[in-house]
Amino acid sequence: MNPSPKTEVELENWRKLNCYNFDSYSINGNFIYEGFGIEKNGSLYVWYYTEKGNKNNLEIFRTESEIIKYAYEKIKSDKWAKTHCVGFNYDKQKTDELLKILTEMKIDYLQDEIPFNKIAYRTFVFGCDINKVMDLPKKYIESPDN
């Protein structure tokens, strides 16, 4: 087993290697609209949360290795950090078709329903399974405007 990351670059590479999404965590400077991140402020490292342009500092660390250990544990324990959306639509039949495909491929998924003007069905796969289904989002993700 690989040792846990000690630097932002190592944490970023670990996320890539394990197919984590980059939507909710800003590690090593990637842009996010909403979520958690690491920022260096002088000699300190700040763990923050940002939403709608408002950034709130949550924790302060003296060393890079301390904040990386903290971030690594947070990311590892966040089931959403490893999800990839492969379906977003309003058609239950189309959603069921997608679930059947994923089941036949023996791919674990998470499916939920959210109110989005009308009921929208979202389907996610985990981690590196996204590499097995790269063609599915083109067919099963609709524009929210539909």
Over which residues does each language-model region extend?
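Short amphipathic beta-strand starts and helix->beta connectors
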Residues: 69-73, 103-111
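Intrinsically disordered, low-complexity charged/polar segments
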Residues: 78-108
